[in-house]
Amino acid sequence: MAVDKEYVEKQLAKLNAKKRLGVGKELKHLHEVINKGENILGHTRGFYNGNTWLMCITDRRIVFLDKGMIYGMKQAEIPLKNVSSVNYETGILGGNLTITAGGSDKKIGKMRKQDVKDICNLISEAAEKAS
């Protein structure tokens, strides 16, 4: 069951979350996919499947959102209990994250270099608590 925008905005404010360039549309629709009682732990943006996606980590799952330019929205998710490993690498300008869940890898590229290590650690800790 989706929550109202205020619920999500309050959680993002507690995290001192900044609006991320390139995922403003997705942030506006995040309340449509967050469930009542689900807590947002962090978020960032990354490049996946040819597009820039919002990646939101909650206490239950990792949610990926890609809002189309004019219409449509794509959503993917990984339940934290299914995450078996998460790895990152950084380069000069950015970083990449690889999440292994259910025997398959999801690779997220072009992440902010400042975010990639923190997001990797956040997912690892949340997955450990969820299993």
Question: Where do the PLM segments sit?
Answer:
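Polybasic phosphoinositide-binding surfaces of eukaryotic membrane-targeting domains
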Residues: G50-V63
